[in-house]
Design a protein with these regions (language model features):
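A general structural motif
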Residues: 2, 27, 75-76
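A generic secondary-structure signal
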Residues: 20-24, 68-72, 119
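A short, amphipathic alpha-helix used for macromolecular contacts
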Residues: 114-121
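Short, conserved clusters of charged catalytic residues that mark active-site
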Residues: 17, 64, 115
């Protein structure tokens, strides 16, 4: 089971697609990873982790942010998700030859998203 979901985000305080697509049970596991100077702009009901000012604006900011997240998470199972993910489900015919929907993909239901995060090991 994924214990924590980290969402690194910059300059998108009013447009958190991934967070808004998650079921409430998973939103409670979210940690938004932000720059300290933007903290006052965010009001989502989740935890916040501010990246060190020393890495803000560097050409390796994303890589250093991922390392910072890794160190913060420690030994738990966690996910790092982009902040603008539409969460979709793919038709199973692509790997089982048995179709489970009319189209090739569709937006995942809240139950499917929750199941995905509960089963990923």
């Amino acid at each position: 089971m994924i214990e924590r979901i980290y969402i690194p985000t910059v300059r998108r305080c009013d447009k958190q697609i991934t967070f808004e697509n998650l079921p409430k049970e998973l939103q409670e596991r979210v940690v938004m990873v932000i720059e300290a100077r933007e903290r006052h702009l965010y009001s989502y009901p989740c935890e916040y982790l501010e990246i060190p000012e020393s890495i803000v604006g560097t050409w390796t900011q994303l890589a250093q942010t991922r390392l910072f997240i890794h160190k913060h998470a420690g030994a738990i199972k966690y996910c790092v998700a982009d902040d603008d993910l539409p969460i979709k489900r793919r038709n199973s015919k692509y790997w089982t030859e048995t179709s489970n929907m009319e189209t090739s993909k569709r937006y995942a239901t809240q139950e499917e998203i929750l199941l995905m995060y509960e089963t990923v090991d």
